[in-house]
Amino acid sequence: MSRALRLRVFAGPNGSGKTTIIDAVRKARVNGRQVDFGVYINADEIAKALKKGYDLSPFELELGSVRFLAFAESSGLVDKELTLEQLADGVLWGAHRVRSKPALPKDRVAQLIAQFLYDELLNAKRKFSFETVFSHPNKLDLMKRAKAAGYKVYLYFVSTEDPAINVQRVKDIRVKQGGHDVPKEKIISRWSRTMANLPEALSIAYHAYLWDNSKHGSAQLFCEVKRAGNRATWNIQAELVPIWFLPYLLVPQEDGNKLSDIYVKAMKRYHGLEDA
């Protein structure tokens, strides 16, 4: 088994279809083998399990209240609504399980536990993967830290052309299937912040894949980029490029290449023009 360090980040706004992409990647074969996710973390799954207890045994780490509270205090994620004292009293760590008292906001506690687990896995040099809305810059910081620590960082990003699509999906699909609701205003504001974080994420990732899922049930992989040092190799399926990606074609690249030129060449190839 390969000991190479890998971090896999599945990112995209609420309701974009990250679960669909994760399922597809799990089923994929690379050189005849399944993709190695390492330890997989999903804050939503942590939140659902907190009442009875979230299983920590897959992590094979020495975790506990002291380390968790030290992380929480330095994280900047505690405030007047979720204090260090509340966490000390309400988050209960066992040998292989962590649970939370009902009085604590389970989604916020789950996010904090997830962040703690990322940090511990990174420090332990373990392979891991996680799912994120990607609206907060701390995920970019995590990717940078992983890259500096010798990880190959893989980014799997999916979005839609309009946050209204995401709002409707969360309402119609996730809630009806037992998923948690997210306020409309949050979905829209997160969509914008997530999209703003994409260019930097692409500059950090060793290998990135981008899907458009504007039409539900037909996610299209339209772009793949792989980096070697400061040089990037882009594979753009020009005929599939969605409207939401067009502004990124104008973002300057570290190696001096212009994505707009790469896009034009890809479009010419698609149409069979000689100078492509």
Annotated model-derived regions:
Residues 13-14:
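The conserved Walker
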Residues 19:
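Walker A/P-loop
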Residues 181-225:
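Small-molecule kinase domains that catalyze NTP-dependent phosphoryl transfer to phosphate-bearing small molecules
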Residues 210, 215-276:
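C-terminal accessory extensions appended to soluble enzyme cores
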Residues 26-123:
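Conserved substrate/cofactor phosphate-moiety recognition/catalytic segment
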Residues 148-197:
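A glycine- and Lys/Arg-enriched "phosphate-lid" helix/loop adjacent to the NTP-binding pocket
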Residues 7-9:
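Short hydrophobic/aromatic beta-strand immediately N-terminal to the Walker A/P-loop
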